[in-house]
From Swiss-Prot:
Interacts with translational regulator CsrA and flagellin(s). The lineage of its organism: Bacteria, Pseudomonadati, Campylobacterota, Epsilonproteobacteria, Campylobacterales. It is found in: Cytoplasm. PANTHER family: FLAGELLAR ASSEMBLY FACTOR FLIW. Acts as an anti-CsrA protein, binds CsrA and prevents it from repressing translation of its target genes, one of which is flagellin. Binds to flagellin and participates in the assembly of the flagellum. Belongs to the FliW family. This is Flagellar assembly factor FliW 1. One of its GO terms (cellular component) is cytoplasm. Pfam families: FliW (PF02623). One of its GO terms (biological process) is bacterial-type flagellum assembly. The keyword Ribonucleoprotein does not apply. Keywords: Bacterial flagellum biogenesis, Chaperone, Cytoplasm, Translation regulation.
Amino acid sequence: MVYELKSPLLGFEEIKEFDLVEVDEMFAKIKAINNPSIEITLANPYALREYSFDIPAYIQALLDINAQSKVRVFCTVVIQNPIDESRVNFLAPLIFNDDNQTAAQIALSIKDYPDFSVADKIKNYVKE
């Protein structure tokens, strides 16, 4: 499904639209429409750990999110070999509103969410 990015993706400010493809219940990827060579791996944070945060009011307004909206959340992943060494950024989740195909990334404060990290290893959450 193609989404319009309503606020810049950190480090990829030129991306305005991307295709979201779910790989399985844990992983997804986004591919830039204007530059298909840009592909970013995402993880479903809820499949990894207990994860909760408040979506700021300005993001709710930007994405037209209300109580009935179908919203999904993913976090960026830096893939490593082996996969359990890959790192997840829990402090900058991507918010997807499936109702109108819009998305935005937010930056959470470590002060407000001290249990979240920008580079948590997947192996800290996946049981072997």
